Amino acid sequence: MDEGFILANKFRRVIFDELVAGENDIKRIAKKNRMIPRVAQRIIDEFVTGGIVEKKGNYYVFTDEGKKLVETIGK
């Protein structure tokens, strides 16, 4: 997964930025940004499938590949 995939969609960018900021609960991210929860869940599932985040319990954290994207995209 590359930065173009994330930057091409505003919801992907919002979720990515929230994860970078330290928020790791997808339900809180969706509520805070007034997103439909199912859309937020679908996007985070894409991130998991793409290998940039992984689920730890009820929370999501960046993988090594995800950390590289954080450095590339930045904030």
Whereabouts are the PLM-identified features?
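Short intrinsically disordered terminal tails
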Residues: 1, 74-75
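A short acidic, leucine-rich amphipathic alpha-helix
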Residues: 28-32
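Short alpha-helical segments that sit at the start of domains
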Residues: 1-15
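Short amphipathic alpha-helical interaction segments
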Residues: 34-48
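A short, conserved structural fragment
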Residues: 48-58
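Short capping segments at the starts of secondary-structure elements
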Residues: 20-25
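Basic, amphipathic "hinge/linker" alpha-helix immediately C-terminal to the N-terminal HTH DNA-binding motif
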Residues: 58-73
